[in-house]
């Protein structure tokens, strides 16, 4: 959970920006959007398989590109 302390002398706008950065860094909004709607287990599995395939393709391209040099 994002938690910041605000001093009396600190500008409120600056504190809000710092809070937003902290929330972004921790991935709270991203996680909330993922869990906003129910996702069937089969759909979840398909999405994970697709992400894994994409990751392996990217890794394969990286390896083949490095061999060219």
From Swiss-Prot:
Keywords assigned: Ribonucleoprotein, Ribosomal protein
GO MF term (any one): structural constituent of ribosome
Gene3D superfamilies for the chain: Ribosomal protein S8
Record's keyword annotation contains Ribonucleoprotein: yes
Gene Ontology CC: ribonucleoprotein complex; ribosome
Superkingdom field: Bacteria
InterPro entries: Ribosomal_bS21 (IPR001911), Ribosomal_bS21_CS (IPR018278), Ribosomal_bS21_sf (IPR038380)
Pfam families: Ribosomal_S21
Keyword Ribonucleoprotein belongs to the record: yes
BP GO terms, sorted: translation
Coiled-coil positions: none
Family statement: Belongs to the bacterial ribosomal protein bS21 family.
HAMAP family named among the record's database cross-references: Ribosomal_bS21 (MF_00358)
PANTHER family: MITOCHONDRIAL 28S RIBOSOMAL PROTEIN S21, SMALL RIBOSOMAL SUBUNIT PROTEIN BS21
Name of the molecule in the record: Small ribosomal subunit protein bS21
Organism: Treponema pallidum (strain Nichols)
Source taxonomy: Bacteria, Pseudomonadati, Spirochaetota, Spirochaetia, Spirochaetales
